[in-house]
């Protein structure tokens, strides 16, 4: 069942019907649906398809590639000894194909690029010297190692420089797309339940496929994560290992960021992980960011050299909070409902979901067309200078000289702004003005699930964004 992806499907269908050859790179995080999209788009019909091995050296990779050549109907008379020979055989498969458009799909390309294999040399030769000279080939390469795809294919500085005709960065579902999936699957979940499931798994389509009819949301979560043989109980063990060949230091970074809600600057990461300050650390941070596990941002008014790295992956955050301790209660989630631990987590997770739906928030605020920067901001208390000490998790700084200071509050009913909350908002506005020196107008903005209870304090809000608006 393919839900959403209309833009990507339209592009792939146009490519198939075009009268020239195309070289397409498809990338995105693990389990986002890249392979499924490509198979559905082309009706599972390929002149040749192959998936790299997660383990194995050059010899094993070429052997598997040769097996795929045989599956395509090619009679292999001699086992290829290198990638140049393997791609020569692929040329013969194409020459023998009767398909009007020869769709060549190579999945998990990064796994095939073993040490000193010269895979990219052979791929370059295949495209530049053969496929691009024809009009009937669509070459699609795909990998979950987003950073590898970006450096080796999309931004290739060698023979494949500027050779891609299309690239598709397949992103996770937004809430609207998850709701469409739930409806298509015939699941009876309301928007608050969809939101809560999103807080755990984000918009990764694969995870949504485990929901079962007839079970409540909490029963589903227990079945998927906490029962003895739950299918995703050990997911964290594979999440990073499947993307990075040597995941240990990546996981160290993730674990360090998981201890600090607002994130860490580079120096703090070095101190926490004991990873040396080097270009290798820079690469690992960039790779984690490109895969969507973390985000890099600059606190409002701060210099770029003090960039902050923040853990964003919903499942990883949930793992650290509830799964890392390996609870033995098979009904753990059902029994944890309305506990302080879960209520605290709901608030933090809701903030992350809001950060992933900035476009929807901007649409509700009527500023979709306004150039903006989305930041977080904090300052320490300094009573002598009238500074209270504030942490603001979302600031939308607008080109029209307005800042939306966003308070994100998860609630099971309409949210009530008390005197304490009102004072906190006023203090944040004051701190932001004093410390940053901004001259922008500051609009207090509430983002919550079911709106706000009308009282004297709520009148001070400039805008209210509700859960339904995040589904736009």
Describe the predicted segments one by one.
Residues 168-193:
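Conserved small helical "lid"/interfacial subdomain of P-loop NTPases
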Residues 206-207, 211-392:
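Accessory nucleic acid-recognition modules appended to NTPase machines
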Residues 34:
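Conserved lysine of the Walker
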Residues 94-119, 123:
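Conserved P-loop NTPase "ATPase switch" module shared by AAA+ and STAND
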